[in-house]
Amino acid sequence: MPKYRSATTTHGRNMAGARALWRATGMTDADFGKPIIAVVNSFTQFVPGHVHLRDLGKLVAEQIEAAGGVAKEFNTIAVDDGIAMGHGGMLYSLPSRELIADSVEYMVNAHCADAMVCISNCDKITPGMLMASLRLNIPVIFVSGGPMEAGKTKLSDQIIKLDLVDAMIQGADPKVSDSQSDQVERSACPTCGSCSGMFTANSMNCLTEALGLSQPGNGSLLATHADRKQLFLNAGKRIVELTKRYYEQDDESALPRNIASKAAFENAMTLDIAMGGSTNTVLHLLAAAQEAEIDFTMSDIDKLSRKVPQLCKVAPSTQKYHMEDVHRAGGVIGILGELDRAGLLNRDVKNVLGLTLPQTLEQYDIVVTQDDAVKNMFRAGPAGIRTTQAFSQDCRWDTLDDDRSNGCIRSLEHAYSKDGGLAVLYGNFAENGCIVKTAGVDDSILKFTGPAKVYESQDDAVEAILGGKVVAGDVVVIRYEGPKGGPGMQEMLYPTSFLKSMGLGKACALITDGRFSGGTSGLSIGHVSPEAASGGSIGLIEDGDLIAIDIPNRGIQLQVSDAELAARREAQEARGDKAWTPKNRERQVSFALRAYASLATSADKGAVRDKSKLGG
């Protein structure tokens, strides 16, 4: 029988000092035999996805106390990728994931907490907390802040849906008037919550649901809706049950590594491919799998991508549907239901509620459930009122979207595409693979060949695009922006958005060893591995080289002879300590970022730290 971790600090005469300090936090004699549960919050006023979380930690804590636990809350940092985008701030985004994971480990282990409730929401916060949870392997439940409502505005006598990406594209489009750009900007992000499309934040919150570590509805129920409050109340109660199951009944099925098993990781990736999730999810799932000591690699993702169809299409891949529409169609469980009927899921998995996949689908899949309360929950919709308050409205759709032929979520028979929404490509400058969000690629450019325009920073590429130096047919190559080379593996949302602004969204390709925002669409290929700074062949591409992209056949090829590449590699190595570094880039890199870069691996490894360098 495992011993409560917290007993280390609450029992025994030699822990009198620790108990004295616990008493100063409000604990009493009656509390010293109870499980201490960390409420890991991420409230900040910097991030719309987190601005409403201040009081939600208290809400969870009250339920933990009522159920017989002791709740202790702490906060992590949270970077807003959208605000950090397009300047030096983006260098800090991906490294913040490791910082969040480490800080959770530090707090939980330093104070010997027994379990956690993770209140996350946005891009690097959910992955960081997920990595920490699987590293620590103590009972955990995730409950995120929820998606933002889609923006809406009237243009050309028509009401259209909007999101952050629309504001960026229109702001850079010289053909758009100042007044229209301002109108879109003011309408794009109307409420608290994670940005309203299938961007990285919402993708990751959907994946924690598929992994079994959060409750049904977590990935899609709007931040503003009153129904979301129940997820927080349930999380506080349920974590005490899970904690007691493990420590008092020796039930290891309550632990996250036994819930988020390899089978669950495969299900999560299957969901990701089917819903056309952000390419960043690949990076984060690979990193989380390593923390769980699960053998889950790019090869597994490649195999899944070849057999899973696209069953859901959401912004930025279409403007018709946003997360509020996914929820109306049944949310994550709705997509999993269609995947299960297609025979594409591992059924022998359980979630934090203790339900198997078949049990979860029977109760929560709107196509089959007989539970009116569940159907009512999935009718939760937007109010269209600007707010930063959680649970501030209770509007509902008149009907559910259970049309699996023409609705937001489709059946296998009526799939948007036989091929899934993500694909892994391999070739002579991406020997370890690269990722493309096929859900956002127009059919006309699934095969594309063009001359390279090479840039050694995102800034130079943006200047060239907006300056008219990139023309139709070009393949923009941005290198030395990987985890080590950036450092920090910047997102390339500005270059891809500005290609659209310049009318080149379907006329050019963009390839990088950096990564893309979940808001990116178009022929945008990222995570090229190995990265240039690690000696990857993307560092050998020269202006004018032809690059052939073949998504249907999963290929990407630099049309240069092996002999020429060998000669270029020899010349690169001859640069000595300047080899595999940018030739003309002025960038101030802080000590903190240099420390991150010294241990960073390429994207095919999840951009995690190289343990071999630390002897571990």
Swiss-Prot record:
Binding positions for [2Fe-2S] cluster per the UniProt entry: 122, 195
| GO BP, sorted A to Z | isoleucine biosynthetic process; L-valine biosynthetic process
Q: Which SUPFAM superfamilies match?
A: IlvD/EDD N-terminal domain-like (SSF143975), LeuD/IlvD-like (SSF52016)
Query: Which UniProt keywords are given for this protein, alphabetically ordered?
Result: 2Fe-2S, Amino-acid biosynthesis, Branched-chain amino acid biosynthesis, Iron, Iron-sulfur, Lyase, Magnesium, Metal-binding
Q: What is its EC number?
A: 4.2.1.9
N6-carboxylysine carried by residues? 124
**Which molecular function terms from Gene Ontology are attached?**
2 iron, 2 sulfur cluster binding; dihydroxy-acid dehydratase activity; magnesium ion binding
Q: Specify the superkingdom.
A: Bacteria
Q: Is Ribosomal protein among this UniProt entry's keywords? A: no
Residues in coiled coil: none
Q: Which InterPro entries match?
A: Dihydro-acid_dehy_C (IPR042096), DihydroxyA_deHydtase (IPR004404), DiOHA_6PGluconate_deHydtase_CS (IPR020558), ILV_EDD_C (IPR056740), ILV_EDD_N (IPR000581), IlvD/EDD_N (IPR037237)
Residues bound to Mg(2+) are 81, 123-124, 491
Output the PROSITE patterns linked to this UniProt entry.
ILVD_EDD_1 (PS00886), ILVD_EDD_2 (PS00887)
The pathway noted for it is: Amino-acid biosynthesis; L-isoleucine biosynthesis; L-isoleucine from 2-oxobutanoate: step 3/4; Amino-acid biosynthesis; L-valine biosynthesis; L-valine from pyruvate: step 3/4
Catalytic activity reads: (2R)-2,3-dihydroxy-3-methylbutanoate = 3-methyl-2-oxobutanoate + H2O; (2R,3R)-2,3-dihydroxy-3-methylpentanoate = (S)-3-methyl-2-oxopentanoate + H2O
* Keyword Cell wall biogenesis/degradation in record: no
What is the free-text note on the cofactor? Binds 1 [2Fe-2S] cluster per subunit. This cluster acts as a Lewis acid cofactor.
* Necessary cofactors: [2Fe-2S] cluster; Mg(2+)
List the catalytic residues.
517 (proton acceptor)
This protein's GO CC annotations: cytosol
The record's annotation in PANTHER family points to: D-XYLONATE DEHYDRATASE (PTHR43661), D-XYLONATE DEHYDRATASE YAGF-RELATED (PTHR43661:SF3)
Q: Which family does it belong to?
A: Belongs to the IlvD/Edd family.
* Role summary: Functions in the biosynthesis of branched-chain amino acids. Catalyzes the dehydration of (2R,3R)-2,3-dihydroxy-3-methylpentanoate (2,3-dihydroxy-3-methylvalerate) into 2-oxo-3-methylpentanoate (2-oxo-3-methylvalerate) and of (2R)-2,3-dihydroxy-3-methylbutanoate (2,3-dihydroxyisovalerate) into 2-oxo-3-methylbutanoate (2-oxoisovalerate), the penultimate precursor to L-isoleucine and L-valine, respectively.
* Quaternary structure and partners: Homodimer.
Name the UniProt record assigns to this protein: Dihydroxy-acid dehydratase
Q: Supply the source organism for this entry.
A: Escherichia fergusonii (strain ATCC 35469 / DSM 13698 / CCUG 18766 / IAM 14443 / JCM 21226 / LMG 7866 / NBRC 102419 / NCTC 12128 / CDC 0568-73)
| Gene it is expressed from | ilvD
